[in-house]
Amino acid sequence: VVEDNAELRVYIYNNLSSQYDVRDAGNGREALQVIAEGWMPDIVITDLMMPEMDGMELIETLRNDFSTSHIPIVMITAKHEDDTHVRAMKYGADGYIAKPFSMELLKARIDNIFERRKEVIRKPGKVEISPEEIVITDRDEQLIKKVMTWLEENVADPDVTVEQLATYVGMGRTSMYNKIKGLTGKSPV
Protein backbone atom coordinates (compact mmCIF):
# COMPACT_ATOMS: atom_id res chain seq x y z
CA VAL A 1 0.00 0.00 0.00
CA VAL A 2 1.62 3.23 -1.19
CA GLU A 3 -0.20 6.30 0.14
CA ASP A 4 1.13 9.56 1.56
CA ASN A 5 -1.96 10.20 3.70
CA ALA A 6 -1.01 8.29 6.86
CA GLU A 7 -4.61 7.94 8.07
CA LEU A 8 -5.81 6.45 4.77
CA ARG A 9 -2.71 4.25 4.50
CA VAL A 10 -3.34 2.79 7.97
CA TYR A 11 -7.04 2.30 7.12
CA ILE A 12 -6.20 0.36 3.94
CA TYR A 13 -3.41 -1.54 5.69
CA ASN A 14 -5.67 -2.59 8.56
CA ASN A 15 -8.47 -3.68 6.23
CA LEU A 16 -6.22 -5.74 3.96
CA SER A 17 -3.81 -7.20 6.53
CA SER A 18 -6.31 -9.77 7.81
CA GLN A 19 -6.41 -11.30 4.31
CA TYR A 20 -2.97 -10.45 2.91
CA ASP A 21 0.65 -9.93 3.99
CA VAL A 22 0.74 -6.13 3.62
CA ARG A 23 3.61 -3.65 3.59
CA ASP A 24 3.11 0.10 3.42
CA ALA A 25 5.01 3.11 2.18
CA GLY A 26 4.42 6.86 2.18
CA ASN A 27 5.56 7.40 -1.42
CA GLY A 28 6.92 5.61 -4.47
CA ARG A 29 10.56 5.80 -3.36
CA GLU A 30 9.74 4.13 -0.05
CA ALA A 31 7.81 1.42 -1.92
CA LEU A 32 10.77 0.73 -4.19
CA GLN A 33 13.01 0.52 -1.11
CA VAL A 34 10.72 -2.12 0.44
CA ILE A 35 10.96 -4.13 -2.79
CA ALA A 36 14.74 -3.61 -2.98
CA GLU A 37 15.03 -5.04 0.53
CA GLY A 38 13.69 -8.32 -0.83
CA TRP A 39 9.94 -8.28 -0.33
CA MET A 40 8.18 -8.99 -3.63
CA PRO A 41 4.52 -7.93 -3.54
CA ASP A 42 1.74 -9.84 -5.30
CA ILE A 43 -0.01 -6.52 -5.97
CA VAL A 44 0.66 -2.79 -5.44
CA ILE A 45 -2.07 -0.38 -4.37
CA THR A 46 -0.82 3.17 -4.95
CA ASP A 47 -2.03 6.73 -4.68
CA LEU A 48 -1.39 9.05 -7.62
CA MET A 49 -0.28 12.28 -5.96
CA MET A 50 2.56 11.80 -3.47
CA PRO A 51 5.78 13.62 -2.60
CA GLU A 52 9.21 12.46 -3.86
CA MET A 53 7.82 9.88 -6.31
CA ASP A 54 4.19 9.88 -7.41
CA GLY A 55 2.08 6.94 -8.50
CA MET A 56 2.74 7.39 -12.22
CA GLU A 57 6.51 7.38 -11.66
CA LEU A 58 6.16 4.30 -9.46
CA ILE A 59 4.14 2.47 -12.12
CA GLU A 60 6.63 3.42 -14.81
CA THR A 61 9.56 2.25 -12.68
CA LEU A 62 7.90 -1.07 -11.82
CA ARG A 63 6.86 -1.71 -15.44
CA ASN A 64 10.34 -0.93 -16.78
CA ASP A 65 12.08 -3.31 -14.36
CA PHE A 66 11.92 -6.90 -15.60
CA SER A 67 11.83 -8.30 -12.06
CA THR A 68 8.70 -6.27 -11.16
CA SER A 69 6.95 -5.75 -14.51
CA HIS A 70 4.46 -8.57 -13.81
CA ILE A 71 3.14 -7.11 -10.54
CA PRO A 72 -0.48 -5.92 -10.82
CA ILE A 73 -0.99 -2.28 -9.83
CA VAL A 74 -4.20 -0.58 -8.70
CA MET A 75 -4.16 3.21 -8.57
CA ILE A 76 -6.35 5.06 -6.09
CA THR A 77 -6.69 8.80 -6.48
CA ALA A 78 -8.82 11.85 -5.82
CA LYS A 79 -8.43 12.80 -9.49
CA HIS A 80 -11.64 11.94 -11.31
CA GLU A 81 -10.77 13.22 -14.79
CA ASP A 82 -10.84 10.73 -17.66
CA ASP A 83 -7.45 11.87 -18.94
CA THR A 84 -5.83 10.94 -15.61
CA HIS A 85 -7.53 7.55 -15.71
CA VAL A 86 -6.39 6.99 -19.32
CA ARG A 87 -2.84 8.08 -18.47
CA ALA A 88 -2.69 5.65 -15.54
CA MET A 89 -3.84 2.80 -17.76
CA LYS A 90 -1.30 3.72 -20.44
CA TYR A 91 1.46 3.71 -17.83
CA GLY A 92 0.40 0.16 -16.94
CA ALA A 93 -2.08 0.35 -14.07
CA ASP A 94 -4.30 -2.73 -13.88
CA GLY A 95 -7.06 -0.86 -12.10
CA TYR A 96 -8.10 2.65 -11.17
CA ILE A 97 -10.31 3.58 -8.23
CA ALA A 98 -11.42 7.14 -7.51
CA LYS A 99 -11.46 8.48 -3.94
CA PRO A 100 -13.51 8.33 -1.88
CA PHE A 101 -13.96 4.59 -2.34
CA SER A 102 -15.39 1.73 -0.34
CA MET A 103 -13.08 -0.93 1.03
CA GLU A 104 -15.46 -3.48 -0.50
CA LEU A 105 -14.72 -2.05 -3.97
CA LEU A 106 -10.95 -2.17 -3.41
CA LYS A 107 -11.10 -5.76 -2.14
CA ALA A 108 -13.32 -6.78 -5.07
CA ARG A 109 -10.85 -5.25 -7.53
CA ILE A 110 -7.92 -7.06 -5.89
CA ASP A 111 -9.81 -10.36 -5.89
CA ASN A 112 -10.78 -9.84 -9.54
CA ILE A 113 -7.17 -9.25 -10.59
CA PHE A 114 -5.98 -12.35 -8.74
CA GLU A 115 -8.81 -14.47 -10.17
CA ARG A 116 -8.10 -13.32 -13.73
CA ARG A 117 -4.44 -14.24 -13.33
CA LYS A 118 -5.42 -17.69 -12.05
CA GLU A 119 -7.69 -18.13 -15.09
CA VAL A 120 -4.82 -17.28 -17.43
CA ILE A 121 -2.70 -19.92 -15.71
CA ARG A 122 -5.48 -22.55 -15.76
CA LYS A 123 -6.68 -21.90 -19.30
CA PRO A 124 -4.02 -20.18 -21.39
CA GLY A 125 -5.38 -18.95 -24.70
CA LYS A 126 -9.00 -19.49 -23.66
CA VAL A 127 -9.59 -16.44 -21.51
CA GLU A 128 -10.64 -13.12 -22.94
CA ILE A 129 -8.69 -10.41 -21.20
CA SER A 130 -9.05 -6.69 -21.48
CA PRO A 131 -5.84 -4.65 -21.07
CA GLU A 132 -6.99 -3.37 -17.70
CA GLU A 133 -7.44 -6.89 -16.37
CA ILE A 134 -3.85 -8.10 -16.62
CA VAL A 135 -0.52 -6.81 -17.81
CA ILE A 136 1.97 -9.35 -19.11
CA THR A 137 4.75 -7.79 -21.10
CA ASP A 138 6.41 -9.23 -24.20
CA ARG A 139 9.53 -9.77 -22.10
CA ASP A 140 7.49 -11.76 -19.56
CA GLU A 141 6.02 -13.89 -22.33
CA GLN A 142 9.49 -14.48 -23.80
CA LEU A 143 10.76 -15.55 -20.38
CA ILE A 144 7.93 -18.07 -19.95
CA LYS A 145 8.58 -19.49 -23.44
CA LYS A 146 12.31 -19.73 -22.73
CA VAL A 147 11.67 -21.52 -19.42
CA MET A 148 9.20 -23.93 -21.05
CA THR A 149 11.62 -24.73 -23.88
CA TRP A 150 14.43 -25.40 -21.41
CA LEU A 151 12.19 -27.59 -19.25
CA GLU A 152 11.06 -29.62 -22.27
CA GLU A 153 14.68 -30.14 -23.33
CA ASN A 154 15.84 -31.14 -19.84
CA VAL A 155 12.85 -32.99 -18.39
CA ALA A 156 14.57 -36.38 -18.64
CA ASP A 157 17.77 -35.24 -16.90
CA PRO A 158 17.62 -36.28 -13.22
CA ASP A 159 20.58 -34.04 -12.36
CA VAL A 160 19.03 -30.80 -13.60
CA THR A 161 18.95 -27.93 -11.07
CA VAL A 162 17.08 -24.69 -10.60
CA GLU A 163 20.43 -22.92 -10.70
CA GLN A 164 20.99 -24.24 -14.24
CA LEU A 165 17.60 -22.91 -15.30
CA ALA A 166 18.34 -19.53 -13.71
CA THR A 167 21.68 -19.36 -15.54
CA TYR A 168 19.97 -20.31 -18.82
CA VAL A 169 17.46 -17.46 -18.53
CA GLY A 170 20.13 -15.03 -17.32
CA MET A 171 18.73 -14.33 -13.87
CA GLY A 172 19.69 -14.98 -10.29
CA ARG A 173 17.94 -17.92 -8.61
CA THR A 174 15.83 -15.77 -6.28
CA SER A 175 14.90 -13.23 -8.96
CA MET A 176 13.90 -16.01 -11.34
CA TYR A 177 11.89 -17.76 -8.63
CA ASN A 178 9.99 -14.56 -7.75
CA LYS A 179 9.38 -13.71 -11.41
CA ILE A 180 8.11 -17.19 -12.39
CA LYS A 181 5.98 -17.42 -9.25
CA GLY A 182 4.55 -13.95 -9.86
CA LEU A 183 3.71 -14.68 -13.50
CA THR A 184 2.40 -18.22 -13.21
CA GLY A 185 1.46 -18.72 -9.58
CA LYS A 186 3.69 -21.80 -9.65
CA SER A 187 7.12 -22.43 -8.21
CA PRO A 188 9.85 -23.33 -10.72
CA VAL A 189 11.32 -25.69 -8.10
Protein language model features and the residues they cover:
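C-terminal output helix
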Residues: 101-110
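Acidic, metal-coordinating helix/loop segments flanking the phosphotransfer/catalytic sites
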Residues: 24-43
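A Lys-centered signature of the CheY-like receiver
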Residues: 97-99
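Charged docking surfaces used in two-component/phosphorelay signaling
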Residues: 10-14
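Receiver (REC) domain active-site loop signature in two-component systems and cognate sites
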Residues: 50
